């Protein structure tokens, strides 16, 4: 092994220090709570609220709120563009996670917000055989039913079993998603197929933890 192949001296310590600094900023934050609602509220912070259900342990690294930028690029789009996104994975102690995503279109990479963009809500439902059902509804008129499994402790892969469209929805026939937590950040790639195009990348983003 050459010297260029070896890790930079102290790089491990720097990574640990960076993780500790992130935790100091995010450990006390949570999703908004309404005190006048009955029962247990949602939490995206494993330090606060109800304990994570045992069925959801394979999804534990996802729990939190994540923000960052990504790129939309696909033949079905008029043009590629950059977006800012917030993704939340929360729970209320029951055997599923609640998922919510909001995005805003940017004028350029790393630029300013110019318009609201896509929104998604859904639920991840782990099953006894390690399969994860991912039910996802889009503001653009799509409903998708994904099935997936963990690749390892910090990576999850999903593919659609069914796609339902309203009459006014965008063209879509299938999709896949790959999520991974890498060095404290959440990265994902979505592939999309349409009636005219085979499955290929459409969305990708890298998001930093802001809650949890």
UniProtKB/Swiss-Prot annotation:
Biased amino acid composition, Basic and acidic residues: 1-11
Annotated SUPFAM superfamilies: Lipocalins
Highest taxon listed in the record's lineage: Bacteria
InterPro entries in UniProt: Calycin, Nb(III)_bact/plant, Nitrobindin, THAP4-like_heme-bd
Pfam family name, one: THAP4_heme-bd
Signal sequence interval, chain numbering: none
Family: Belongs to the nitrobindin family.
Protein name (record): Ferric nitrobindin-like protein
Species of the source: Saccharopolyspora erythraea (strain ATCC 11635 / DSM 40517 / JCM 4748 / NBRC 13426 / NCIMB 8594 / NRRL 2338)
């Amino acid at each position: 092994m050459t010297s260029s192949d070896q890790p930079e001296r102290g790089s491990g310590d720097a990574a640990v220090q960076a993780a500790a600094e992130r935790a100091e900023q995010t450990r006390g934050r949570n999703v908004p709570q309404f005190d006048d609602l009955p029962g247990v509220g949602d939490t995206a912070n494993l330090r606060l609220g109800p304990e994570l259900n045992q069925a959801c342990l394979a999804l534990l690294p996802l729990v939190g709120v994540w923000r960052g930028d990504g790129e939309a690029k696909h033949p079905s789009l008029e043009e590629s563009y950059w977006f800012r996104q917030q993704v939340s994975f929360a729970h209320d102690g029951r055997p599923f996670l609640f998922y919510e995503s909001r995005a805003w279109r940017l004028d350029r990479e790393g630029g300013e917000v110019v318009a609201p963009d896509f929104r998604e809500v859904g639920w991840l439902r782990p099953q006894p055989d390690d399969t994860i059902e991912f039910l996802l509804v889009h503001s653009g008129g799509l409903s998708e039913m994904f099935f997936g499994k963990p690749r390892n402790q910090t990576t999850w892969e999903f593919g659609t079993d069914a796609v339902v469209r309203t009459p006014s929805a965008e063209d879509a026939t299938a999709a896949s998603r790959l999520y991974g937590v890498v060095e404290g950040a959440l990265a994902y790639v979505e592939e999309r197929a349409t009636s005219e195009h085979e499955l290929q990348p459409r969305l990708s983003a890298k998001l930093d933890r802001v809650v949890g």
